[in-house]
């Protein structure tokens, strides 16, 4: 099953107040495992960058000045996500911004039903525990040392690892689909437990029971002729 992990960065907290998207990052999953296919773009928000937002993601107005506006990336973004379920951490926030941008272009909204909210998943699985991305990385021992600031693609990559754990953890060998190799697929090692040697000879009762069982066998292998 194809899913897309998605994250965005913005100029603020509310598109209703004029805030805009500045970065989109997506990671493709197949059976909850990253395939290596990603979508990533920076976006010129056509407005200033508040200091509070810049402190979160480090993206400056100068850096974004020569980047494409949303209308130039909308079609390629929609083509990448398609109708696949979207795995999002606090989906109301990201979908709010995405749908605001899509509406401005006269395009259809992404329905809430298409989103899988990992905040809700985490709170359902671990009631009362912190559900931030950093907190979940710590819970699952996922290395987030690169995350000195927020970044849409980096956060989507981390969320992909968190989502896999929320869905039950890594299962080597699963997630391969015909015609597509999933990266980071470790070899499966099979181990069987060794039984300790029997410390005593069979009893008389056990020998009788074994003899009776053998007599019931129809054409046992050891009685067959070459």
What is each of the regions a protein language model found here?
Residues 85-88, 97, 101-102, 132-191:
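Acidic, Mg2+-coordinating catalytic module of metal-dependent nucleases/exonucleases
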Residues 74, 130-133, 207-210:
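Alpha-helix initiation and N-capping motif
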Residues 1-113, 123-127, 135-149:
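Conserved non-catalytic scaffold segment of RNase H-like nuclease domains
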Residues 165-226:
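Acidic two-metal-ion nuclease catalytic site recognized across multiple nuclease folds
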Residues 117:
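A structured binding-face within diverse protein domains that lines the active/interaction site
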């Amino acid at each position: 099953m194809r899913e897309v992990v998605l994250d965005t960065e913005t100029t603020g907290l509310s598109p209703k107040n004029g805030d805009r998207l500045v970065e989109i990052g997506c990671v493709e999953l197949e059976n909850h495992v990253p395939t290596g296919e990603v979508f990533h773009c920076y976006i010129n928000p056509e407005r200033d960058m508040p200091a509070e937002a810049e402190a979160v993601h480090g993206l400056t107005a100068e850096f974004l000045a020569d980047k494409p506006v949303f209308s130039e990336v909308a079609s390629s973004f929609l083509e990448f996500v398609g109708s696949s379920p979207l795995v999002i951490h606090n989906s109301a926030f990201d979908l709010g911004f995405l749908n605001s941008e899509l509406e401005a272009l006269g395009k259809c909204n992404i329905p809430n039903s298409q989103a899988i909210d990992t905040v809700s998943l985490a709170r359902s699985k671990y009631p009362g525990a912190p559900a931030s991305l950093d907190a979940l990385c710590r819970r699952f021992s996922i290395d987030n040392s690169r995350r000195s600031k927020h970044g849409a693609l980096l956060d989507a990559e981390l969320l992909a690892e968190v989502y896999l754990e929320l869905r039950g953890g890594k299962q080597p060998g699963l997630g391969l689909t015909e015609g597509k190799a999933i990266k980071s697929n470790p070899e499966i090692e099979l181990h069987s437990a060794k039984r300790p040697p029997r410390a005593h000879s069979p009893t008389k009762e056990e020998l009788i029971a074994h003899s009776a069982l053998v007599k019931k066998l129809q054409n046992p292998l050891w009685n067959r002729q070459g």
